Every structure is written in structure tokens, then in C-alpha cells.
Amino acid sequence: MSVHDLCCIGYITQDKIVTTKNTIYMPGGTSFYFAHAIKHLDPNGFLLVTSLAHTEMNVVEDIRKEGIEVKALPSARSVCFENIYGENQNERTQRVTAKADPFTMEGLQDVNARIIHLGSLLADDFSLEGIKFLSGKGLLSVDGQTGRKREKL
């Protein structure tokens, strides 16, 4: 059983960014940005766990090319956000346009790390049972993203 020093569990998202000037599509999410920060440090001993649709696996492959170990759990869909910015770039409206399958204890059974960071984006990303399960595997931290105006389709 391999034990990593650090593990981040969270969704790599497919984001639609709408501004007054253009619209772009790009990957995002806590786990995506976490992995890109880690690659500038020593990625040895780091594991990224995500869940996304097969159509987005190219993002995982790009992260792996950066020397990051990734466990990608299959999902029928990826989490998709639409972020709409007006003239004031400090204000946005965010809509959830698709959700991935939830993380399960079964899918995380072989994840072992001294520190596990949950990059939570939505309230139901991790069940209470899953959080309790992971807390028995290592020191647990959670990135709870709240306080944003979100609309769900």
C-alpha cells in the first residue's frame, strides 16, 4: 500500500467564462489549480484524485505530463460552471450547468496520504461518511467555497 505525503481530492471542472468582450472555455476547479501549484514545488509524493467525463481526460493527461500522479475516477459528466462577469470584474454570477458523479468510499479506498485536502466545490461533493472515512487515513483539510452567488440549472 503506497502512502503519499499529500493528496488533493476534487473535481477538475470545465468552465465557461463569459465577459463583456468574449467567451472562453477552460479547465478549472480547486484540484486543477492545486496540481499546477504543486508542479512548481516537488511533485514527488503528491497524488491528485479527480472525477470527470472521458471527454475531459486530455486535461488529466496534460497534468500527468507535468510529472503529477493522477487518479482519475470515471464519471458520466464533468462538473461545469458558467461564470458571467459584467463590467466590474470583481462581480460574477456563477451557474452550475453539469455535475459529476459524487466521490465514493469505494472509489477512494486505495487513497492513502499523510495529508488529504478536499477541494470541495459544491455542497454534495463529499458525503459525511466519506469525510469520516478519509479522516481515518490522514490529516484532513477542506477548502469550503461558500459565499458566492450561484444558480443551478
Model-inferred region functions:
Residues 29-40:
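Histidine-anchored nucleotide/phosphate-binding helix
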Residues 120, 144-146:
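Short, structured patches in soluble enzyme cores that scaffold and shape functional sites
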Residues 3-4, 14-25, 40-119, 124, ...:
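Conserved N-terminal subdomain of the carbohydrate kinase-like
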Residues 11-12, 30:
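Active-site metal-binding loops of divalent metal-dependent hydrolases
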